[in-house]
Swiss-Prot record:
It comes from the Bacteria. This is Replication protein RepA. Keywords: DNA replication, DNA-binding, Plasmid, Plasmid copy control. Residues 304-315 have a biased composition (Acidic residues). GO terms for molecular function: DNA binding; DNA-directed DNA polymerase activity. It comes from Salmonella typhi. Belongs to the initiator RepB protein family.
Length: 351
């Protein structure tokens, strides 16, 4: 079989996995409502909240993370004896870069791959990123160009301990935008297609991401929590802080995590109880609903605040333990009942 044929097979296999109960090979196909994401990337914190209003956020902070434990099962690492695996590059955000990455995953899954490259119209790539095509303006083209550049600068390096041998590749090998043809061409490294083949893949619902527009901390925690197995063990506050990879004071980071978890509860994605065991705080996840629940009547919107810079640092009185509440029965209200409920809320707010 030709080299191109082998590469195409690798790409098809990247979006397939075997049902452990039936043995049937199931192909995971991304669409506008969901995307296939390798769990390793979701748990590592590759895409994190980025406060762009600060000088450091605008400049583009460089980060490096140890991915040895998550990526050591790659056949490349096993065959060559690579033990030290790192991902390095510009800090990638949730608001732009994650959407662009979603578009990249969609492109390789839904369009013909020639060798290791896929080419598609720019407007189609915008649609695969989950962005309305009506917004495909010059400003959007510049934004996506910057995002593709940031993703392409992120490298995955494989090194052997006690040896000078190493291999360096990119999350996206090359990304090219042709103004003449108005197309986007993406090239990936076939040696790391196996990254998508991990038995720990997850089909992320994008509905929650869209509901959490501009709430990057909540978006990042959603991608992490959704990648966990059924009935996950309690998640420590420290682990969620690490997933967000923020740089503010610990007490401010704790407040950011709590705010993000509450936002996930507000959109109907999950319910949880916060408990304290010794000196550590944990979140017990009761359920997860990627498709969310019916929207509740809107309440008076509070002004938005930056995710990882909160007013005041003297927040020592943050509650560490949230008492468990009994989950009430959910009912659908008629338009008349919703109108009455809204009037009652407005009256209460005026008091």
């Amino acid at each position: 079989m030709s080299e191109n044929g082998n590469k195409n097979i690798a790409i098809v296999e990247a979006f397939s996995e075997t049902d452990k109960k039936t043995g049937e090979v199931v192909t995971l196909v991304p669409n506008t409502n969901n995307t296939v994401q390798p769990v390793a990337l979701m748990r590592l914190g590759l895409f994190v909240p980025t406060l762009k209003s600060t000088a450091r956020g605008r400049k583009g902070q460089m980060v490096s993370m140890d991915a040895s434990a998550e990526l050591k099962q790659l056949s490349l690492a096993k065959a060559e004896g690579y033990e030290d695996i790192r991902i390095s590059g510009v800090r990638l955000d949730m608001d732009n870069d994650f959407k662009t990455w979603v578009g990249i995953i969609h492109a390789f899954a839904k369009h013909k791959v020639v060798g290791d490259t896929v080419t598609l119209p720019f407007v189609e790539f915008v649609r695969l990123c989950g962005i309305p095509t009506a917004r495909s303006s010059a400003k959007l083209r510049k934004r996506l160009d910057s995002s593709l550049t940031r993703i392409a600068t992120n490298t995955i390096s494989f090194r052997s301990k006690g040896s000078d041998e190493y291999y360096v590749t990119h999350l996206v090998q090359t990304a090219k935008y042709s103004t003449k043809n108005d197309t986007v061409s993406l090239q990936a490294d076939p040696k790391i297609f196996e990254l998508y083949q991990f038995d720990k893949k997850v089909l992320l619902q994008l509905r929650a991401i869209n509901e959490l527009s501009r709430k990057e901390s909540a978006q990042a925690l959603y991608t992490f929590i959704e990648s966990l197995p059924p009935d996950p063990a309690p998640i420590s506050l420290a682990r969620l802080r690490a997933r967000l990879n923020l740089t503010s004071r610990t007490i401010t980071q704790n407040a950011t995590v709590r705010k993000a978890m509450e936002q996930l509860r507000e959109i109907g994605y999950l319910d949880y109880t916060e408990v304290k065991r010794g000196s550590s705080v944990y979140f017990i996840i009761h359920y997860r609903r990627p498709k969310l629940r019916p929207a509740l009547p809107p309440t008076k919107a509070a002004p938005e605040e930056p995710e990882d810079i909160l007013p005041g640092d003297d927040q020592e009185d943050i509650i560490d333990v949230v008492p468990e509440e009994k989950e009430g029965e959910m009912v659908m209200l008629s338009k008349e009942e919703l109108a009455i409920l809204e009037e009652l809320r407005k009256a209460k707010a005026r008091k």
